[in-house]
Amino acid sequence: NLYQFGNMIKCTIPKRLSWRSFVDYGCYCGKGGSGTPV
């Protein structure tokens, strides 16, 4: 859900990055940075 997605983002990227930076960055989700790119 949206709450879990928000927590996932917080755990995955540095706080200095904005939402726009996150979208451009294309982060990998999951422990150790592994998983499916978003």
Curated annotation (Swiss-Prot):
Name the record gives this protein: Phospholipase A2 2
Pfam families given in the database record: Phospholip_A2_1
**Root EC class:** hydrolase
Q: Which prosthetic group or cofactor does it need? A: Ca(2+)
Q: Which InterPro entries match?
A: PLipase_A2, PLipase_A2_dom, PLipase_A2_dom_sf
Sorted alphabetically, which keywords does the UniProt record give?
Answer: Calcium, Hydrolase, Lipid degradation, Lipid metabolism, Metal-binding, Neurotoxin, Presynaptic neurotoxin, Secreted, Toxin
Binding residues annotated for Ca(2+), in chain numbering: Y28, G30, G32
Q: Which domain of life is it from?
A: Eukaryota
Q: Please give the tissue specificity annotation from the record for this chain.
A: Expressed by the venom gland.
Q: Give the signal peptide as a residue range, or say none if absent.
A: none
